[in-house]
């Protein structure tokens, strides 16, 4: 019997912007690149691709993804997995975005789930990274017409 438990990073932020603007910023490849990473993202269920940035110690800089859920202006989810030589036994998580209209804007919720005990370094990096990334997301959304 497998009793392994996993953890999740959850970051929520209220943004004084429209659902449409936030949705565009989390689903359109050029906008994603402005606040997250270079990518070949398409918000189509089943689409597979990569997010990538310069490599650093302990990481080749590439994250594989597959889009799992697309509900326009409401929910987006995709896998977020180690790539290349790091894939075997590497990080295998799911990123889920939930957008909810609230007075004066949008409640943005990002959850990256599936961190195992051996993923502690990735978990800590994700906690730091997603807080920073949501700040960058809000900066990009504020520039959209």
Residue ranges of each PLM-predicted region?
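Hydrophobic ligand-binding cavity/cleft-lining segments
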Residues: 1-40
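Intrinsic-disorder/low-complexity, polar/charged segments enriched in Ser/Thr/Lys/Arg/Asp/Glu/Gln
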Residues: 6-12, 48, 62, 75, ...
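Hydrophobic/aromatic beta-strand elements that line small-molecule binding cavities or substrate pockets
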Residues: 13, 63-69, 93-100
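A short, structured loop/turn motif at beta-sheet edges
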Residues: 19, 68-75, 98-107, 142
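Hydrophobic pocket/interface hotspot
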Residues: 22, 32, 49, 67, ...
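Glycine-rich portal/gate segments that line the openings of hydrophobic small-molecule binding cavities
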Residues: 41-82
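Beta-strand/loop substructures that line and gate deep hydrophobic ligand-binding cavities in soluble
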Residues: 83-131
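Short, highly charged C-terminal tails/helix-capping segments
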Residues: 139-145
């Amino acid at each position: 019997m497998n009793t392994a438990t996993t953890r999740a990073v959850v970051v929520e932020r209220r943004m004084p912007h429209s659902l449409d603007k936030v949705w565009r910023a989390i689903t359109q490849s050029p906008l994603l690149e402005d606040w997250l990473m270079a990518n070949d993202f398409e918000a189509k269920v089943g689409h597979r691709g990569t997010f990538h940035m310069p490599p650093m110690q302990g990481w080749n800089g590439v994250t594989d993804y597959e889009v799992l859920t697309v509900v326009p202006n409401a929910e987006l989810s995709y896998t977020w997995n180690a790539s290349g030589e790091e894939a075997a036994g590497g990080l295998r998580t799911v990123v889920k975005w939930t957008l909810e209209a609230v007075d004066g804007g949008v409640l943005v919720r990002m959850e990256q789930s599936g961190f195992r005990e051996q993923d502690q370094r990735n978990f800590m990096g994700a906690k730091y990274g997603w807080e920073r990334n949501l700040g960058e997301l809000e900066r990009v959304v504020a520039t959209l017409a």
